Amino acid sequence: MTSTATVTVPPRITAENVATLFPEVDTSLAREVFPSTVEGSAKDSEELAGYDEEQVRLMDEVCIVLDDDDKPIGSASKKACHLMTNIDRGLLHRAFSVFLFDSNNRLLLQQRASEKITFPDMWTNTCCSHPLGIPGETGAELDAAVLGVKRAAQRKLDQELGIKAEQVPLEKFEFFTRIHYKAPSDGKWGEHETVTDTQILVDYILFIQADVDLNVNPNEVRDTKYVSAQELKQMFTQPGLKFTPWFKLICNSMLFEWWSYLGTADLDKYKGEKEIRRM
């Protein structure tokens, strides 16, 4: 006798149903960061008991909730967007990954702080975070979305690494593409830049080449390191080092190819992709 497993596919998330499926989503979208004193804030959450106070506060930041086509349809707290229970039901939000290279074409890596709620102590690219559901960082069309992501990247490079805006001006950021990933963390928290049935990504990949001064925020970053492509490949072979899943995905699928053309006109052919890469 043959048994058939039943697979439940999450409904397609749209502007019309997102508030019904996820009551924590605010469909007004453009709003200020939730203050930590509001009812239902992350500091009052049982799921976050025992975590670092500052990292818990940051879970009240407002992420941009998207439909399958990377169009903003609402906003929700970082906590709501990173709960695997919501991710598994298809809650989608926008993210970015910055790859900063110095004048010697070395990539700046960071090791995430032990205090981080998701992926603590793992090595990753220079900066990875989320544009917020606030004026200036939210965009519906691709050009506006890219500008919003660049502004968010500039903000987070300062907040995490102490890199001042004048050293990373918006016009120096280069947008390459968007990718999909779903990266479980510890079963409760994760990253999901798609819905499971269509695999539409919203992780915006940015390059910037600049020599910068670092003033690392120890609550965000445990360590930093500049590496060549060969040195990074050697790091990947060391069993004692752990890397964020999206970083290894980007490296193995596209980064090393792009990196080989850094500083040449040949790199231009990879920039500004309109299509979303489904990984």
Curated annotation (Swiss-Prot):
Binds 1 Mg(2+) ion per subunit. Pfam families: NUDIX. CDD domains: NUDIX_IPP_Isomerase. It catalyses: isopentenyl diphosphate = dimethylallyl diphosphate. Residues 91-249 form the Nudix hydrolase domain. SUPFAM superfamilies: Nudix. PROSITE patterns: NUDIX. The active site is at C128, E193. It comes from the Eukaryota. NCBIfam families: IPP_isom_1. Belongs to the IPP isomerase type 1 family. Isopentenyl-diphosphate delta-isomerase; part of the second module of ergosterol biosynthesis pathway that includes the middle steps of the pathway. Idi1 catalyzes the 1,3-allylic rearrangement of isopentenyl (IPP) to its highly electrophilic allylic isomer, dimethylallyl diphosphate (DMAPP). The second module is carried out in the vacuole and involves the formation of farnesyl diphosphate, which is also an important intermediate in the biosynthesis of ubiquinone, dolichol, heme and prenylated proteins. This is Isopentenyl-diphosphate delta-isomerase idi1.
